[in-house]
Amino acid sequence: MFQSEWGGRLTSIFYNTRRVALVDNENMANIVKAIPEGFEGATPYLSIKGAADAIEFYKKAFGATETMRMAGPDGRIGHAEIKIGKANIMLADEHPEISFLSPRTLGGSPVTIHIYVEDIDALAAQAEAAGAKVMRAVADQFYGDRTGQFEDPFGHVWHFATHKEDVSHEEMQKRAAAAGGQS
């Protein structure tokens, strides 16, 4: 348990939904959530060489919606946000001077972004038509999802899925063994 500055107990420092008063000026106080709505879980923050082009690609390939963009004095995107379905994703142009490096500079990325979508088949066709590289073709999986994996032109890897079936842990282990996979 943690003590708040007001003496109340918090059950966790994470997912704290308490509201905090912030004063904008002498006459007005705003009440804000410590964790903004829609950002309760992990939010990927992508470093991209060519962030403006990437935003346009994500709109075309994945149906992304741009929710904000801030350019720096040098014209590079200092911060932007998009949504793919309900998933919030932050991104910015690569800034080597602060060690914010893109997959292209690093020679790839070990991170895969996983997002559930309503129709993986439609998204896959749209992504491929927009120029995404298919890394794993769309297929039904033993764990109940239909999935596909793609690399964007900027070096980020995306794993999209549509959940098709609830599978118990025991059944999942049986199916994995039958498929020759790990349990």
Question: Where are the language model's segments positioned?
Answer:
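Vicinal oxygen chelate
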Residues: 23-49, 55-56, 62-151, 160-183
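Local alpha-helix boundary/kink/capping signal
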Residues: 17-18, 50
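C-terminal catalytic core of tyrosine-transesterase DNA break-rejoin enzymes
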Residues: 154
